[in-house]
Amino acid sequence: LAYLSKARELQSKYATMPHGMTVLVGCETENIESPHSIDALTALLHGDAVQDTPVPPPFVGRGTVDYIVGSVHHVHGIPIDFDEPTFLKALQVHGTKDGYTSLLHAYLDAQYEMLERLRPEIIGHFDLYRLFDPSAPWYPECTTPHGREVLNKLKRNIHFASSYGALFETNSSAFRKGWKEETYPGRVILQLILRAHGRLALSDDSHGVHQVGLNYTRVRDYLLREGVNELWYLVPGGTLPCADKGGNLSEVHAASEEARQARELSDTPGRDAPT
């Protein structure tokens, strides 16, 4: 909560400067252990209100933060991006045979749960699971049963996020971590996003001032090679849409959910998604 207080203070400060700068205050998610991790985040963002009246997914965090970055960094409670030995431990949990595919299934299921429950505005480093072994056989041939199952889950998550207008983070940090020709999302995921008419946002995932904007030129070159010609960004939004009108959030959610579900089932779920 100290973070929110300081962030809001700086948000106001920069907005009123002569050459004002728009600052958005957000938070990044985790799904270490289902369902407790997301339960804890929802409770933190809404306090006792969650116990009395559950907040529909599109409105989680409204009034507390300006946006949510939906990320997954753990599989079955084990970090996959901390260091290589820990990643290998996560991989070994799934056995030596088809270990990569099994880990990927677990990751995508954890990601999907997070998407369903939180509807984050930004999807963080979609294919973070590739960090320490980007050339591994993550994606079996689509002509095999394993390959079709993986592809279906990838498309499931991408179509769901695209259908409500999420932005997929194009994250330059993989370059500073040793990747050469691509970053998050890698080519396979990026092309699935583009086919779904998903939206991309630019991010450096900086953990300090020395990383701000790092490798953006390389990201630009990568995106141009892959046929990307536009990027999206967030702007300040409102609080709960009917908080001052006596409305019911569940009714507001239900009114838009049918259209979202129809988009999700289409080949291009992001085409007419809300902005």
Language model features with spans:
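Charged catalytic cores and adjacent phosphate/nucleic-acid-binding surfaces used
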Residues: 130-131, 138-275
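A general structural detector for well-ordered alpha-helical segments in enzyme core domains, enriched
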Residues: 3-10, 40-44, 55-56, 110, ...
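A metal-dependent hydrolase metal-coordination microenvironment
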Residues: 1-86, 93-105, 211
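Residue-level marker for buried hydrophobic side chains located in beta-strands
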Residues: 25, 122, 200-202
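Active-site metal-binding loops of divalent metal-dependent hydrolases
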Residues: 29, 72-73, 126, 204-206
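A short helix-to-beta-strand connector/capping loop
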Residues: 18-23, 64, 119, 198, ...
